[in-house]
Amino acid sequence: MAKEDTIQMQGEVLENLPSATFKIKLENGHVVLGHISGKMRMHYIRILPGDKVTVELTPYDLSRARIVFRAK
């Protein structure tokens, strides 16, 4: 899938789940499950509850997301 097909949104991490999955509340109020992107995993970027993150959603499944950026 091309990167142009993704939807980028801001959200806040609510809680950590097993196997590097997170529950994320988006700015529009929806709660989705998200996993860390490969580059973030490769550079050992840690994500904790309360962190502001940028996620990518696909138009095919709006209940799952990929975390691509953690705000400082």
UniProtKB/Swiss-Prot annotation:
Q: Where is the S1-like domain?
A: 1-72
Look up keyword Lipid metabolism and say if it applies.
Answer: no
* MF (Gene Ontology): ribosome binding; rRNA binding; translation initiation factor activity
Q: From the Swiss-Prot or TrEMBL record, state where the protein is found.
A: Cytoplasm
- GO CC term, one of those recorded: cytosol
Which keywords annotate this record?
A: Cytoplasm, Initiation factor, Protein biosynthesis, RNA-binding, rRNA-binding
Cross-referenced Gene3D superfamilies, in alphabetical order?
Nucleic acid-binding proteins
Query: Chief location of this protein?
Result: cytoplasm
- What CDD domains has UniProt attached to this entry? S1_IF1
Matches recorded under PROSITE patterns = S1_IF1_TYPE
**Is Hydrolase one of the keywords UniProt gives this record?**
no
* Family (UniProt): Belongs to the IF-1 family.
Q: What does this protein do?
A: One of the essential components for the initiation of protein synthesis. Stabilizes the binding of IF-2 and IF-3 on the 30S subunit to which N-formylmethionyl-tRNA(fMet) subsequently binds. Helps modulate mRNA selection, yielding the 30S pre-initiation complex (PIC). Upon addition of the 50S ribosomal subunit IF-1, IF-2 and IF-3 are released leaving the mature 70S translation initiation complex.
UniProt xrefs under HAMAP family:
IF_1
Spell out the PANTHER family in the cross-references. Answer: TRANSLATION INITIATION FACTOR IF-1, CHLOROPLASTIC (PTHR33370:SF1)
Its assembly, as annotated, is: Component of the 30S ribosomal translation pre-initiation complex which assembles on the 30S ribosome in the order IF-2 and IF-3, IF-1 and N-formylmethionyl-tRNA(fMet); mRNA recruitment can occur at any time during PIC assembly.
Q: What is this protein called?
A: Translation initiation factor IF-1 2
